């Protein structure tokens, strides 16, 4: 019981007295309900309505005031909680009258409670009384009260009154006798407002201590609490009381102490954070616990309803309003003293001795026999339980040993079975390259769809590549895919095992056969769906080429026919000793121009126009699937075979229709492109000449395809795509790594740029995604006509310069002087150096990633075929140069992060001596700090004119990142990705390079 609670505030309004009635004084206050009082005088500046816990009107008797406003607080003293009851108000408002009745009713209830519970607890009541007269404390129970008492501070009890007499009550009559003495000793006087006016503050204190009659650890403590009945003297005005002399002096002391009480109440109502002036008055000092400490408090404010006391009544209500907000923290007071505990134990010991004496000898002997019998039974039970425990322990040990043996044997069996299984699988894998499920899986992935190519052309992702390099094993993959499915399935696992393990291996083989059969069925279903989707994709791609081309575009049909004628001429040399070598070289060369895998080779053949070869390969793919299906005899596989056959016929019809349509769609401008190679067709009949011509024709086809893609935005073929797909959807339409789709991506990017779409190029970032946006719409808004015409002029210039390059190269071939690709005349080399210098300067201005600079610098070294890529790079950097200042800061931050990452790679890539050589080479002192970071900050610095510095920077970065030799990677794989793309690098995902160099193989 106890805790924080607010003071219980009640207001009692007395009726008009005889003097007020004689003066015809009006009643201005009215109680509208049990909690609200209002003022009927409307000239008040402040509010006229007040709400309290309880409001008592004229007709309410003192008994009701006690029951509703003070009884609960007064009786909590019996539970060990301190309590206080105040009577506050102006002079002649009825304070003494109210407190006399409340004191009497409270004493009656307290003694009634004691009489009811005296069998359970022992109560001790102590009574003391004092008054504060002219700021002097007097003892009301002492006859000689002329000597004032001092106030002392006790660390346990707080403020105490020295030498205050405290009487222990015998009964109720004794209390009444003491109350009458207090009434006689209290100072009273007569004023003009009250004939019997109290001239002092009276405090009656009743202390109650209670302890349990029966001893127990829970009830050994003693409850000690006190209740205070405080009858305050009324505040008065000298002008109203007409006091003088001693009465005036008394009134001054009364008002001063009440003013201090009001100040304390007001500050307590606002919280206990500041200083509370308890010591400014002896009244507040004595009642400190009652006001804001360990006690429950009830205040009864009395007031007069007369208009003549209106201001005093309002002050009383304001005091009550503040007191209503004061919070006290009452706690139960437990007194656990050693003396009380010793006394309680002594009483309990005496009681038990008396009970023992009262027991007779007969009863004692019978009791001892009974206890002896019970003790014997308990001992027997304990012995029996010990035997059971011993037996259970033995059983537990046996069970544990069995479990351990079982676990050991199981582990040995698993290890032996796993070793046999791994050896058997190793023998099986050595005997054949593919089993049935893997054959179908590889067949589907090679000819129909490659999941590794998914997302290759996305504008915001980086493709994931396998760790191995497909260039080294291109011939092996080509040969493996051309094998017949029956040959791959003829291998049968033959495992010879020991006689002791034959049965286990046989069971394992049966399980493996079941698993492989299920995998075969699942792969078969997935490959059937992939075949359908692949055929649909082929139809869609072929349909794109059947659309009419733009007026100023070049014809691809003528070039396709040249490629076919060249291939036929190569086939005529089957009798030559170099036949096989030439076929392998052509296959490898075409694959290097586009991609690194078997499905990409087939897509490259589609792009270059070898439709007959494409048809043959697709038919071969379908035949492979049909032959692999013959190993299964189910009805479902037969149905699938029929579906694939129908797809094959549709594909053949579509291919033949497309070829027939394109015979009528060859513009006359194709002659200009074919003239480049006409002179060499008659003379170059050797193997080297044919190989060189095929290579040059492939590059020319690629160039004209890129030009066509840039201008295709006005052609019907591109309009079809543009009408059906939004720009954002068109970038995500296809995710293949084929040559055709690389060109389609370039086409879509150019068209979207002309229409005002936004391309995003994101520099490499190592702590956050930093995106630099090129808003083509802003360029279009500034000067739409100029932008469109400049783009066409740029593409026309590229086409004209490339024709010049090819014409020069054609003249060289007429003279049968074959120059290496990395050689050029003095004028072209000077032009290349000029473009290279401009690109390096723009790299520095645009904060291009260092890895991009390195690979571009190492890959493009001045070959005639590098001209287009140098122009595209210059065009891209010129767009980036116009980016905003915010984007420039973000890209600079990304380059700084890249340098920090490269600095971390130096200790991983070089040994101690090699690192010192690198530091010395780049002018970094060995005794300095953060030497690796100093080196990386010197890479690709502002010295853009120094080509040797650029070479050394590119060489070091290539070593740190782990670039493969640039000759093994086709330039088209890097050059075609120079269109604006988006790449993001996050700290959690490690390194992801941009699409400009994401197709490069890395080592280390």
UniProtKB/Swiss-Prot annotation:
Binding sites annotated in the UniProt record for ATP: 89-96
GO BP, sorted A to Z: microtubule-based movement
Annotated Kinesin motor domain residues: 6-326
Cross-link (Glycyl lysine isopeptide (Lys-Gly) (interchain with G-Cter in ubiquitin)): 881
Listed PROSITE patterns: KINESIN_MOTOR_1 (PS00411), KINESIN_MOTOR_2 (PS50067)
Compositional bias segments (type: Polar residues): 653-663
Biased composition (Basic and acidic residues): 569-582, 634-652
GO CC terms, sorted: microtubule
Coiled coil: 335-402, 517-576, 634-661
Keywords in alphabetical order: ATP-binding, Coiled coil, Isopeptide bond, Microtubule, Motor protein, Nucleotide-binding, Ubl conjugation
Keyword DNA repair: no
Top-level taxonomic group: Eukaryota
One annotated GO molecular function: microtubule motor activity
Pfam family, one: Kinesin
Disordered: region residues: 567-599, 628-671, 802-830
Family: Belongs to the TRAFAC class myosin-kinesin ATPase superfamily. Kinesin family. KIN-7 subfamily.
Name this polypeptide is given: Kinesin-like protein KIN-7I
Organism for this UniProt entry: Arabidopsis thaliana
Lineage: Eukaryota, Viridiplantae, Streptophyta, Embryophyta, Tracheophyta
